[in-house]
C-alpha cells in the first residue's frame, strides 16, 4: 500500500478507507480504460461529456472533481491550471495497480486531496523474472475502436528498465446525445433539446514512456520520461447552423522524473528525493494554453523503533513547487510558487493495530498559508473484526480559472478564499479467518466551508451567460455510508459488491450536482474450465441533479456487462466483452450521450 502513509505498508495495517485494484480486477470488470474500473469503487461517482475520450470527471465521497488528487508514479498529474483530472482518455494498457484512498488527505498529499487520492502505478520492469519480457494487448470493438499497446521490460542484478507504447482510436459516438431526453427542473422548468447530435466525435491518443533504474533494496535511482498526445472532438450547445457544433481539443503532456533513495525500512534513516517536470500544451476552439510544473521534494524516514511486534517511525517531508501558466485568455504569464513541510508519525503492529498522526503547513505565493492535520487509527478486536477510524482537515486553493477568470465567460475574483474541509470516518471490517471473505461498513462525514461555486453575473441569452467563481456562505454538509464486500466463494468463483449512500448538500440545503444518493456495483468472475473464464458486472447509479441554474432531475439507470476469455496457450489470452447488454439509453451528464450496447474483442500476450 503506497498511498495511505508516507512509506509503503501492508493493506491490513491501513486505517484509512482504501480500495486496491490490480490487473486481475481490470480483466474481471471488463475494463479497458481507468474510468471503467474506477466507477466500480465504493464512494465514486463519474460524469462524462460524451463517449470514449470525452471529458470525464470523478466525484469521490461527494467532493468536487478537483478535490481529488491523481498521482501517477509518485507525480501529481492534476492539471496545472487547477481543474479536475480528466479520466476520459487514460488507458489501462500500462497500468499495474490503482489505489483509491478516500477521505481528507491534505496532511500527506497537500492541496487537491480534500476528497481523496487516486494513486496509479505503471509497469516498471522492477523484479521481472528475466532480462527481456514482452507484453502486448491489441483489441477492436464497436464504433471503429482500435487499440494496441506493447511493453518491453526486464530486470537483472538490480538494474531494470521498461519501454512502453500504446495507441487508441475510435470513431466514437456523438458527444451530444442523439436521443431526446426530457428533464424536469426547478420551478417547473423543463429541458428538451432543440437539436440532437448527428455526427461522430472521434478520439485518438498516443502514449510512449521509458524508464531505467537500479534498485538493490538498500539504495536506488530511477529516471522516467513519458509523452502523450491526444485529440478529441466534442460538441457544444449551439446549433449546427452556427458552425459551432464540432469542436476539437488537442492535448500534449510531457513528464520528466528523477528519483532516488538511500537506506531501507530496517535502517535507522532512509532518504528519498524526487525531481520532476510536467508540461502541458492544450489547444481547443476557445484558445490555447501552455503550462509547466516543476517539483522538488525530499523525505527523511526516521525508523527509531524497528525491533519487536510494534514498530514506530517518523517521516519529514519537504516540497517545493513552481508552476507557470500562459494562456491566450491572459495577456501575461501567471506564476505560482508553493512551499510545504509535513511530518508524519506511524505506529504499526504485527497484529494489524495502527496509529498515525500527520500535519502539513503550506505557503502559496498567491493564496497564502494553510495548515492541515490527520489522525488515523485501527484496532483488531479479533481475527474476524477490525475497527478503523480517521479525522482530518483539508484545504483546496482556487484554481487559475476561478481566481483570474477565463476568456470573458468567467470574471476574475481576487477575493476568493481557499475551500476548507473537516471530516472523518468510522468503520468495521469483518473477515473470515482465512480472509477469503471481507465485509467493510464505513460511515463518513465532512463539513466544507467557503465552497467555491460559479455564479451567474449576467446573461446575453438563456444559454450564454457570464459567471464568476464565489465562495458560498455557510457550510456544506456531506454524509454517507459505504458497504463493500469481496470474496472467494469457491476455488473457481470470485465476487465483489458495494453500495454507497451519499447525502451531499450545500449551505442552502440543495443537493450538490452530479452526486447520486445511491450507487451500487457487483460482479462475479467464474473459471469455467482450465482454459475458459467468464464474468458479469452490474452497476446502478441513482437519481441525481445536474445544472446549478435549472437543477434538472436525472433518472437512475442500471448497466450490465458480460465478459468471456479463453487461454490459447501459456502466453496468449483472447477475451471478448459485451457492454451495456440491454442497450440502456441514458446520460451521466445532461445533454451528453453515452454508449449503447457495444462489443470489444482483444488478444493479450506475455513472453
Language-model segments: residues:
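Extracytoplasmic beta-strand/coil segments of soluble accessory domains associated
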Residues: 35, 39-75
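A beta-strand signature from Gram-negative outer-membrane beta-barrel systems
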Residues: 90-135
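Face-selective signature of the C-terminal outer-membrane beta-barrel domain
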Residues: 213-230, 247-370, 374-380, 438-443, ...
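Short acidic/polar hinge/loop motifs at secondary-structure boundaries
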Residues: 75-104, 413
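Gram-negative outer-membrane beta-barrel transporters
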Residues: 352, 445-447, 470-547, 573, ...
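Periplasmic-side early beta-strands and strand-to-turn transitions of outer-membrane beta-barrels
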Residues: 119, 127-129, 135-139, 146, ...
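Outer-membrane beta-barrel signature, preferentially recognizing the C-terminal barrel domain
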Residues: 240, 245-259, 263, 365-367, ...
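Short, acidic, small-residue-rich periplasmic hinge/interaction motif at the N-terminus
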Residues: 1-27, 65
Amino acid at each position: 500500500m503506497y498511498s495511505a502513509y508516507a512509506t509503503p505498508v501492508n493493506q491490513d495495517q491501513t486505517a484509512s478507507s482504501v480500495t486496491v485494484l490490480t490487473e486481475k480486477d481490470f480483466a474481471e470488470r471488463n475494463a479497458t480504460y481507468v474510468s471503467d474500473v474506477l466507477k466500480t469503487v465504493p464512494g465514486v461517482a463519474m460524469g462524462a461529456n460524451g463517449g470514449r475520450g470525452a471529458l470525464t470527471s470523478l466525484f469521490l465521497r461527494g467532493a468536487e472533481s478537483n478535490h481529488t488528487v491523481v498521482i501517477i508514479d509518485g507525480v501529481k498529474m492534476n492539471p496545472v491550471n487547477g481543474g479536475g483530472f480528466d479520466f476520459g482518455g487514460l488507458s489501462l494498457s500500462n497500468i499495474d495497480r490503482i489505489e483509491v484512498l478516500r477521505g481528507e488527505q491534505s496532511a500527506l498529499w497537500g492541496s487537491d486531496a480534500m476528497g481523496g487520492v487516486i494513486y496509479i502505478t505503471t509497469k516498471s520492469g522492477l523484479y521481472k523474472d528475466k532480462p527481456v519480457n514482452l507484453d502486448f494487448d491489441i483489441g477492436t470493438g464497436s464504433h471503429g475502436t482500435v487499440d494496441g499497446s506493447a511493453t518491453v521490460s526486464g530486470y537483472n542484478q538490480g538494474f531494470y528498465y521498461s519501454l512502453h507504447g500504446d495507441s487508441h482510436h475510435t470513431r466514437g459516438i456523438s458527444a451530444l446525445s442523439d436521443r431526446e431526453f426530457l428533464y424536469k427542473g426547478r420551478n417547473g422548468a423543463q429541458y428538451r433539446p432543440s437539436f440532437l447530435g448527428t455526427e461522430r466525435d472521434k478520439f485518438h491518443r498516443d502514449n510512449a514512456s521509458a524508464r531505467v533504474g537500479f534498485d538493490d533494496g538498500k539504495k536506488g535511482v530511477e529516471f522516467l520520461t513519458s509523452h502523450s498526445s491526444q485529440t478529441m472532438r466534442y460538441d457544444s450547445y449551439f446549433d449546427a447552423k452556427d458552425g459551432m457544433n464540432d469542436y476539437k481539443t488537442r492535448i500534449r503532456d510531457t513528464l520528466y522524473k528523477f528519483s532516488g533513495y538511500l537506506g531501507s525500512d530496517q535502517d535507522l534513516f532512509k532518504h528519498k528525493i524526487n525531481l520532476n517536470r510536467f508540461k502541458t500544451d492544450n489547444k481547443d476552439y476557445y484558445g490555447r494554453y501552455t503550462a509547466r510544473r516543476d517539483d522538488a521534494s525530499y523525505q527523511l524516514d526516521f525508523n527509531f523503533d524497528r525491533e519487536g511486534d510494534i514498530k514506530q517511525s517518523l517521516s519529514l517531508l519537504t516540497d517545493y513547487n513552481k508552476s507557470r501558466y500562459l494562456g491566450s485568455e491572459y495577456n501575461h504569464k501567471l506564476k505560482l510558487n508553493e512551499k510545504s513541510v509535513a511530518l508524519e508519525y506511524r505506529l504499526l503492529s504485527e497484529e494489524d493495530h495502527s496509529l498515525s498522526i500527520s500535519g502539513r503547513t503550506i505557503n502559496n505565493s498567491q493564496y497564502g498559508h494553510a495548515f492541515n492535520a490527520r489522525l488515523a487509527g485501527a484496532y483488531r478486536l479479533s481475527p474476524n473484526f477490525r475497527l478503523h477510524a480517521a479525522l482530518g482537515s483539508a484545504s483546496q486553493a482556487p484554481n487559475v480559472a476561478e481566481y483570474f477568470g477565463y476568456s470573458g465567460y468567467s470574471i476574475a475574483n481576487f477575493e476568493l478564499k481557499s475551500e476548507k474541509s473537516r471530516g472523518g470516518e468510522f468503520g468495521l471490517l469483518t473477515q473470515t479467518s482465512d480472509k477469503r471473505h471481507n465485509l467493510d461498513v464505513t460511515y463518513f462525514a465532512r463539513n466544507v466551508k467557503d465552497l467555491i461555486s460559479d455564479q451567474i453575473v449576467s446573461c446575453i441569452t438563456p444559454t450564454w451567460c457570464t459567471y464568476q467563481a464565489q465562495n458560498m456562505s455557510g457550510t456544506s454538509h456531506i454524509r454517507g455510508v459505504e458497504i463493500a464486500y469481496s470474496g472467494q466463494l469457491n476455488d473457481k468463483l470470485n465476487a465483489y459488491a458495494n453500495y454507497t449512500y451519499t447525502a451531499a448538500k450545500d449551505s442552502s440545503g440543495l443537493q450538490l450536482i452530479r452526486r447520486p444518493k445511491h450507487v451500487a456495483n457487483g460482479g462475479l468472475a467464474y473459471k469455467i474450465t482450465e482454459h475458459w473464464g467468464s464474468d458479469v458486472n452490474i452497476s446502478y447509479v441513482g437519481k441525481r441533479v445536474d445544472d446549478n441554474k435549472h437543477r434538472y432531475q436525472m433518472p437512475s439507470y442500471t448497466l450490465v456487462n458480460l465478459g468471456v476469455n479463453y487461454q490459447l496457450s501459456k502466453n496468449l489470452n483472447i477475451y471478448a466483452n459485451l457492454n451495456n447488454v440491454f442497450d440502456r439509453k441514458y446520460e451521466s451528464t445532461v445533454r451528453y450521450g453515452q454508449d449503447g450496447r457495444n462489443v470489444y474483442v482483444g488478444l493479450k500476450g506475455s513472453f
